[in-house]
């Protein structure tokens, strides 16, 4: 009897009982040497070809008084248009292409195009735009904003204080503090034989705009609009080899950053003081580059997974130094900075039994600053400078070691825990070595049909080598001061989460977290910090067409700090309280008007508040900082035809903040020329009409 092995036969063999497989009759033992697999075909399989998806266009009207609202609405233009698309083309023999666009034409728009042959190669082209708006009400007396040379009016009259400058208020012009980024990328992936594959991608980011800066002469300062015109070119390439239970990959990452401007020149608005200077310069972000090469691999059998990665790289910058206004000889025209990087990651996961899994990892990262040390003469202003100084080549080495166990006690009940160790070694710091030891455990129960809950606790300690005042700052800091990132610390943390679905259409989720950082040996500095947060979420499918959801998040961080006004024991105590409340709700109704209309409403409210009190004999309040924002989005979508849908969105944002750093008049501080009041208090609205068409 002749027996032909076909797809149906294979399916039957694959579902044969374990008893047959155990006796050597499993599918793995089938003799397939004479089977002509190249002649196999699936006559019942139909591969759909052609184009499918949706495309859409939209136009919106933006009524805004404060440009900050563009962060929420995605555009700063009064009238804005957008293009959306999700289109896929499938051809014969595995050829495929896709186009995805989201709000293209607006500040947060993005586009991604892919084309290739499935399982062989793919070409990717992508574009994304990101914008961040700060203020359009900043004021400055300078001309040349956006360039590297800021000048005052020709008839400017200097004075000893900003309030005495006769032409200041009449010379003010408004400017926009915002940053825009455009990213364009190109990538190629190729799958060779079954053993190897390769990829290469390139991305260019162009960042433009204005950001805050300041220039000073002795104790006088002017707020300046720093021009931003950055270009960053990034490239990534790699090759991957793989087998049945292993793979290895070699990758390269490179980044080259260029700044169109290397310095910002500006006039002084004040009477000449130290050095009788009437103009100055500040250095801007220097050109730099970074290159890394990494080798990684993984081995996986039925019991163990071993993975490793080795990385080496270098960061460098050789920008010419800005020497304008510096009256001494410089030891070198450019710093020629170099930082070498080495990284190593090892990890193993072992399945000891069906119920027990063990894991361990080791991470090593070394940052070696090989910049040449030079001797520099400081400009003399007070008793802590005017001396010879040296650039400090900071090095850092970090090691992390983790072990963990994951044990399934019974079905729906699991216990896991572990131990984490971290060591950081630094030079030219108040403390050369810090060690952190942390133990943690978590217990999870999801054996109940409608409940899923877990609780986790951890305790950690940080200590290290002897704390010594740095020779670079010893004359300027209290010997009792302990920097919070280097000081001894005990950390206790507890968190839990409960998810309950009493009925199929209702889900309730609640989580809480508490963390206490106790800086036990600190006399001057941060002595204690508490972080408490909790959140609640509810989602309810009221009917098949009506869905409602709501959430609430709360966090409060309380910190205590001790200080001294006489370089000795504590004379004052500071208390800082930061709170954040976020609440939101949404409702959507589908299948109205004969299953053609969907309507919805989303609302969120956020309130962040910060308050600082200082006690030194009497209690002084620095005043609250707060930011409050309401966001509403009302929308409706109507299915006009089988393929065409119309959508209407109405968005509102009400925002108000109180920040002492922004709430200052241009001449509000005698020795500062500021940007004026840049606090926010506005209500903005946006209407968007859009249409989508199904191809």
UniProtKB/Swiss-Prot annotation:
UniProt keyword Transmembrane present: no
Which Pfam families does the annotation name? Answer: MtrB_PioB
Listed under GO cellular component are: cell outer membrane
What InterPro entries does the entry give?
Answer: Decahaem-assoc_OM_MtrB/PioB, TonB_rcpt_b-brl_sf
On whether Ligase is a keyword of this UniProt record, the answer is no
Which residues belong to the signal peptide in this entry?
1-21
Record's keyword terms, sorted: Cell outer membrane, Membrane, Signal
Q: SUPFAM superfamilies of this UniProt entry?
A: Porins
Using the record for this protein, list the coiled-coil segments as residue ranges, or answer none.
none
Q: Which domain of life is it from?
A: Bacteria
- Tell where it localizes: Cell outer membrane
Q: Which NCBIfam families match?
A: OMP_MtrB_PioB
* Name of the protein in its database record: Outer membrane protein MtrB
Organism, per UniProt? Shewanella baltica (strain OS185)
The record's gene field reads mtrB
